[in-house]
């Protein structure tokens, strides 16, 4: 159970505080080369109606055949969500009419889903964490796509997406703010990307959310919920929740009642609008699909899949903190995307002394590399600085060959020109000066030239930093800062 909502999370209305209650249904496209019940391709971006089998087009007499890879991916996702795997599940027909649904029904799972209850720990931006319950995960077919812009008076249907396998992941109503909802979706996306069960590409529609929102006075029973369909970005999920909560509060404070309905989010206006009244389960007339046998597998089959799971983000974060002394925040940043965690681990693999340089490597990946990638609008996969090059820079700092200031200059050279960092340091004379006699002359000159500052630093030792800065400036950043600091203290009698 989650802790009571903090007062700061409550929404202030004209007549008092309100609590928003949120549950999410995430539709995640299964990473598979073929559709759920046919051999048609699932690749995004093909010409219209080119990835359509006779099964997908619902031609008479065509029978569905289950794709085992989709079943495996659903089980692996369930295991990644710490959920119960049902060894027997059933496919049902969900009956409704829509032009992009050629069968006149959707093959889904109703009473007996493949995955039961689970939970996900979600870290929040404010440093807190919450546990969000998972109600179920089931497999179902995606529908086709209506095209309204191809003809002035007609709508066309593209069935490329029809029959593509989806995992619908239903949360419990455990979320209490738009920030929590966004963090939850991000965490689910990260887990599935680590598992390789969904690519999480929201721009291509691989991950979509139906957002259920209701409001109530703190401590009162749940209010009437509205469902906002097919929200396709994490930012829009937050905006839709904020608007919908305010809309419902406004109605209730004016003495009205909330209609249970399905709504759409208009991203251009930042508001939701009514689509239709919300259906109940009986409206869909679910019944077991007579063309498909129940799915049955053994516990040994599930155990084999569990044994083959990769290290997931929570475990990886804990290892980074324990083994390399990273802060929880830094470890969280590194594991938030599979690619960034893999890059950091590739840097670690190149280090001779991971205990000494592991934390420094994390700082460089997060601050220097990520900062520059964001500035240039590049992904980590296209980084001009490789893991091996970054590891070499980190080692040069760790062993005292170059200073932090020189390391940033070296990073810039490697970013723009390439090359081996150690060779560049030798060729360009970038080594840190550790010869005390060479540093001592610079120190003596600066002390002699600033008698007024010497008098001040004796009275106010914090001013020592000014002298260190002057020495570093005179040496072009090559002097060893610690050696400079120690030498100045001795010269000034501090």
From Swiss-Prot:
UniProt GO MF annotations: asparaginyl-tRNA synthase (glutamine-hydrolyzing) activity; ATP binding; glutaminyl-tRNA synthase (glutamine-hydrolyzing) activity
GO biological process, one term: glutaminyl-tRNAGln biosynthesis via transamidation
Entries under SUPFAM superfamilies matching the protein: GatB/YqeY motif (SSF89095), Glutamine synthetase/guanido kinase (SSF55931)
UniProt keywords, alphabetically: ATP-binding, Ligase, Nucleotide-binding, Protein biosynthesis
Enzyme Commission code(s) on record: 6.3.5.-
Signal peptide positions (record): none
Transmembrane segments: none
Reaction catalyzed: L-glutamyl-tRNA(Gln) + L-glutamine + ATP + H2O = L-glutaminyl-tRNA(Gln) + L-glutamate + ADP + phosphate + H(+); L-aspartyl-tRNA(Asn) + L-glutamine + ATP + H2O = L-asparaginyl-tRNA(Asn) + L-glutamate + ADP + phosphate + 2 H(+)
Family of this protein: Belongs to the GatB/GatE family. GatB subfamily.
Function field: Allows the formation of correctly charged Asn-tRNA(Asn) or Gln-tRNA(Gln) through the transamidation of misacylated Asp-tRNA(Asn) or Glu-tRNA(Gln) in organisms which lack either or both of asparaginyl-tRNA or glutaminyl-tRNA synthetases. The reaction takes place in the presence of glutamine and ATP through an activated phospho-Asp-tRNA(Asn) or phospho-Glu-tRNA(Gln).
Subunit composition and interactions: Heterotrimer of A, B and C subunits.
Protein name as catalogued: Aspartyl/glutamyl-tRNA(Asn/Gln) amidotransferase subunit B
Protein species of origin: Rhodopseudomonas palustris (strain ATCC BAA-98 / CGA009)
Lineage of source species: Bacteria, Pseudomonadati, Pseudomonadota, Alphaproteobacteria, Hyphomicrobiales
Recorded name of the encoding gene: gatB
């Amino acid at each position: 159970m989650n802790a009571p909502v903090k007062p700061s999370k409550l929404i202030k209305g004209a007549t008092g505080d309100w609590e928003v209650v949120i549950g999410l249904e995430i539709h995640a496209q299964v990473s598979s080369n073929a559709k759920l019940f046919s051999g048609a391709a699932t690749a995004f971006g093909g010409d219209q109606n080119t990835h359509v089998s006779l099964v997908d087009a619902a031609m008479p007499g065509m029978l569905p055949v289950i794709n085992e890879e989709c079943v495996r991916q659903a089980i692996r996702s369930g295991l990644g969500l710490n959920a119960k795997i049902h060894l027997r599940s059933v496919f049902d027909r969900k009956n409704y009419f829509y032009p992009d649904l050629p069968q006149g029904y959707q093959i889904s799972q109703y009473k007996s889903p493949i995955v039961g209850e689970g939970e996900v720990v979600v870290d929040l931006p404010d440093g807190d964490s919450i546990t969000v319950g998972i109600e179920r995960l089931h497999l179902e077919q995606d529908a086709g796509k209506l095209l309204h812009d191809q003809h002035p008076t007609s709508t066309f249907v593209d069935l490329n997406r029809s029959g593509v396998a989806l995992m619908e992941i239903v949360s419990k109503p455990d979320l209490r703010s738009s920030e929590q909802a966004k963090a939850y979706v991000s965490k689910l996306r990260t887990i599935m990307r680590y598992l390789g069960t969904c690519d999480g590409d929201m721009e291509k529609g691989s991950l979509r959310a139906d957002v259920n929102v209701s409001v109530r006075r703190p401590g009162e029973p749940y209010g009437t919920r509205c469902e906002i369909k097919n929200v396709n970005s994490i930012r829009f999920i937050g905006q839709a929740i904020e608007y919908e909560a305010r809309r419902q509060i406004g109605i209730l404070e004016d003495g009205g009642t909330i209609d249970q309905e399905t709504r759409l989010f208009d991203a251009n206006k930042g508001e939701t609008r009514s689509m239709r009244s919300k259906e109940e389960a009986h409206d869909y007339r679910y019944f077991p699909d007579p063309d498909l046998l129940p799915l049955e597998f053994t516990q040994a089959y599930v155990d084999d899949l569990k044994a083959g799971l990769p290290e997931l983000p929570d475990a990886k974060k804990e290892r980074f903190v324990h083994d390399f002394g990273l802060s929880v925040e830094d470890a969280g940043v590194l594991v938030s995307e599979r690619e960034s965690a893999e890059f950091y681990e590739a840097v670690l693999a190149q280090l001779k002394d991971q205990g000494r340089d592991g934390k420094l490597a994390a700082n460089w990946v997060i601050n220097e590399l990520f900062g520059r990638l964001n500035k240039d609008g590049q992904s980590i996969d296209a980084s001009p600085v490789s893991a091996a090059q970054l590891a070499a820079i980190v080692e040069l700092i760790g062993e005292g060959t170059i200073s932090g200031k020189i390391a940033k200059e070296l990073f810039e050279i490697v970013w723009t020109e390439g090359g081996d960092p150690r060779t560049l340091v030798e060729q360009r004379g970038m080594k840190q000066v550790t010869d005390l006699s060479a540093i001592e002359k610079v120190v003596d000159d600066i002390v002699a030239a600033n008698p007024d500052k010497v008098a001040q630093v004796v009275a106010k030792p914090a001013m020592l930093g000014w002298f260190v800065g002057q020495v570093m400036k005179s040496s072009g950043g090559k002097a060893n800062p610690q050696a400079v600091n120690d030498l100045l203290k001795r010269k000034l009698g501090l």
